[in-house]
């Protein structure tokens, strides 16, 4: 399953915060969850594209950052799969 997560920092990120999130992301990789994070300009500070087996796995990943960021997550269906549903 794929998920798109829009991210806003709750406070301006410092080197310590970034180091902490990097450690958490490294731990998440070891759990087999694939993701890419892009910092963005505009209303959101970053966007993450997550590939996880279940919604529960994706939610557990995001809960690791509770208190640090606000998120909005959407399930993403690959275009090819969505077209098959038409």
Segments (PLM) and residue ranges:
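Short S/T/G/P-rich N-terminal loop/turn motif that feeds into the first structured element of a domain
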Residues: 1-30, 34-35, 40-45, 77-86
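An amphipathic, aromatic/His-enriched active-site/gating alpha helix that lines ligand/cofactor pockets
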Residues: 52-83
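Short, well-ordered beta-strand segments in beta-rich or mixed alpha/beta enzyme
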Residues: 4-7, 41-63
């Amino acid at each position: 399953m794929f998920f798109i997560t829009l991210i806003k920092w709750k406070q301006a990120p410092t080197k310590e915060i970034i180091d902490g999130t990097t450690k958490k992301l490294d731990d998440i990789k070891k759990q087999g969850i694939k993701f890419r994070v892009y910092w963005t300009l505009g209303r959101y500070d970053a966007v993450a594209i997550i590939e996880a087996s279940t919604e529960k796995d994706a939610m557990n990943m995001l809960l690791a950052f509770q208190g640090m960021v606000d998120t909005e997550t959407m399930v993403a269906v690959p275009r090819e799969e969505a077209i098959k549903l038409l």
